């Protein structure tokens, strides 16, 4: 494969390798994606986003986790996509529809001059039924504020789908005290979740929610957009948060608004870090050696 042009973006520290491929010429595979996202041998990122054309919307977001697996949706990543297509002149519209594997999402770009500073995404309505998450158990049953034991510790846990699965756990004390590296992998691969799950550890912090997140197929990340939405939904259902709240991650703060019509809106920044070219063959050789 020839050299690939790419750009590095992040949304509240959640970083992505972005590849513009409107001609549908770039062939990706899990091993190449993992090599590109490898922080020692590749560019380094939480995920890779290929921007392509869509027959149903303005663009399609082909999103992959850092391990090469395919994911349905990424709230931070889709904001970065909005910034990329606008600032590269691929669109002159500030209202966009982007197709994802979790459906079409509407973006509102908030600009200053020629630059996109923040993006609001209509993330759609959350789903609670186990069949929608997916989660083991009766298809119609919900899992909200239920006890979940791991390593002898019982958490109050809720399962929510924002187009991808999330397990939200309310914890006591400071977020820094949570052993995310130990608990995250076990919960991601818990037998209750046949397709694995993202995991959020939540501490109420005044009018805000402090969160650490373990992402499926990635590990602990600086932030998670769909996770922020799942956290506000779960915390609101538990009576420990308003339906609109700031969600604080290591990488920054996201605004989440769960409106009365059931839809969740996510607002946050998108930042272009740098652009470059990479040699897939050379990266693969270093990774295998």
Q: Language-model segments: which ranges?
A:
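A glycine-rich beta-to-alpha transition motif near the start of alpha/beta enzyme domains, typified by
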Residues: 1-115, 168-289
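Membrane helix-loop-helix hairpins that form the core translocation module of multi-pass transporters
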Residues: 114, 118-126
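Beta-strand scaffold of nucleotide-dependent catalytic cores
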Residues: 121, 158, 214
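Active-site/binding-pocket entry motifs
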Residues: 126-127, 272
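Active-site glycine-rich loop that binds ribose-phosphate moieties when present
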Residues: 127-156
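Selected transmembrane alpha-helices and immediately adjacent juxtamembrane segments
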Residues: 157, 165-168
